[in-house]
Amino acid sequence: MVRIISLLFASIVFFSFIESKSTPYVVVLGIAQDGGAPHAACTKECCIHKWDNPQLHNQVSSIGIVDPLTNEVWIIDATPDFSVQLNTLTMEQKRVFKGVFLTHAHIGHYTGLIHLGREVMGAKEIPVYAMPKMEIFLTNNGPWSQLIELNNIDIKSLKNNTSVSLNDNLSITPFLVPHRDEFSETVGYKIQGPNKSLIFIPDIDKWEKWNINIQDMVHENDFSLLDGTFYDINELPGRDMSKIPHPFIVETFKVLEKVKNKSSVHFIHLNHTNPALNTSSNATKEIRKNGFNVAKRNQKFNL
């Protein structure tokens, strides 16, 4: 009887291991705001110690989607750190790069597309998924229009709240969020796997400006990567914070105060001034004390 139980336990462990190796997942490729950290021209304490130590650099906010079964990968947002992030995601081209999903037309989220052009990769019809205004922006403005003309990229049109099937295991759905939409609309994404789902909202103005209840969305999904650009209103002395609206992390504490799955929330898209970039800071401790987390580069979320 003991032998049977032991064999049964060993079988469960074995098949759980096999399943974990084949489960699709999201991987964090960067957690910083558009300019990364250290930030251009920044000589403040938040940056000065990072310049000479590449290991302390925080790459720009981006996530990858990986399906180990099919060996396929997709990237959400083409950042200024695209070359490094693509290399990480594809494991030095050992995985098949299937496309880019864009959130909006701010510099940290689409300018990495330039690496797909003939000056660098000379890519062949890489699918780039974009909302209508984003598609118009890329089509009508160089150098992005050249990527289309030379067939480096193949624009795939997205629609609000309309799911896109990536393969038999994965789907992705864009949803509009309020943001400074100078050149395009802004979206977040829901990524659905065989077992779990994740939402990614790197940029939004304020939660109360959205016609969707963020409490419900967090509750309904297994993981949430949310805009954590600024910790609080005191972060940029001398700047009018109303001109660069984001939900302060301390505001999100209150908004999600009654949510039961707080630990599923991971803040991302942190400005170079954000003390939460420092894992031992009081801000980071306060985030954890309130039941939340800060996303980490290379962190994986099984779907």
Protein language model features and the residues they cover:
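Cap/insert and terminal regions of metallo-dependent hydrolase folds
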Residues: 195-197, 204-300
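Active-site environment of divalent metal-dependent phosphoester hydrolases
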Residues: 35-37, 106-112, 137, 180-181, ...
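Active-site metal-binding motif and surrounding structural segment of the metallo-beta-lactamase
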Residues: 66-129, 222
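Active-site neighborhood of divalent metal-dependent phosphoester bond hydrolases
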Residues: 122-124, 134-157, 273-274
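Bacterial Sec-dependent signal peptides at the C-terminal "C-region" and cleavage site
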Residues: 12-23
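Sec-dependent N-terminal signal peptides
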Residues: 4-13
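Short internal beta-strands
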Residues: 101, 126-135, 225, 266-268
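Core dinuclear metal-dependent hydrolase active-site scaffold
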Residues: 21-89, 155-216, 300-303
